[in-house]
Amino acid sequence: VLSYLFKRLEERFDGQPTLLILDEAWVFLDDPAFAGRIREWLKTLRKRNVSVIFATQSLADIQRSTIAPAIIESCPSRIFLPNPQAVEPQLREIYEGFGLNARQIQLIARAEPKREYYYQSRLGNRVFELGLGPVTLAFAGASSPQHQKTMNAFTGVIDPADFALVWLRHA
């Protein structure tokens, strides 16, 4: 089944700009077949105009992976979420493994949750905010189970063309 899935995905990598988003990346990293293919993709997909995005709530998931060196080397641009525990010895060591120094780890530890993020790349590093306004947040921030339940309740009841207006009134 995985071989078929990999084949179907690779058929879609046709040179058009593509994002391969691996959310909850630990699931993929824990599976030897997936991990091996991800390692291969990290080395080859750039030539096919594919960018790979790993999303995980725990950097330890990546650090413990058998392909951690390939991920760290092939993904030089990273966004770190605020983590007050980042300065604790065990976690600090993990952050250092991603090339962060004491000052950068301190910035991550002091960043305001759900507002500030730390960007790391070869071109530079900085704390940033998305600066989303209330309208954008009404859509981009609607990710809770209750939000999903409400959206599902709208399905089939309202005209899809009216969804944005109805959602904004609800939010």
Predicted features and spans:
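Conserved P-loop NTPase motor module
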Residues: 1-15, 79, 106-171
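Conserved P-loop NTPase motor cores
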Residues: 1-104, 134
